[in-house]
């Protein structure tokens, strides 16, 4: 069972919320200011919960699309609790 930190999830969701429809954002721990392990755990958790309109994994690198309705709801929930 994945147990990501709330702040790591908020960081990824906030970054993805800035994307336009159809674009993908490569997840880079250095760019996001997260530890690699924390970023991977949070990304897996959020992808499993359908928080992005799409995602892609190629050669161990993950990219995510804009937020789905579920992602917007989760960001709101995490940011306000």
What are these language model-derived features?
Residues 2-32, 80:
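Short amphipathic alpha-helical interface segments
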Residues 6-10, 40, 69:
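Non-catalytic, well-ordered alpha-helical scaffold segments
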Residues 63-81:
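Short, amphipathic alpha-helical interaction segments positioned at domain boundaries
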Residues 16, 42-43, 65, 71:
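Small side chains
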Residues 3, 32-49, 62:
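Short amphipathic alpha-helical interaction segments
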């Amino acid at each position: 069972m994945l147990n990501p930190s709330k702040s790591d999830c908020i960081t990824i969701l906030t970054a993805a919320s800035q994307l336009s429809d159809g674009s993908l954002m490569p997840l880079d721990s250095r760019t996001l200011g997260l530890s690699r392990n924390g970023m991977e755990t949070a990304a897996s958790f959020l992808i499993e919960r359908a928080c992005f309109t799409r995602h892609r994994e190629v050669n161990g690198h993950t990219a995510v699309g804009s937020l789905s309705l579920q992602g917007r709801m989760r960001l709101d929930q995490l940011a306000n609790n």
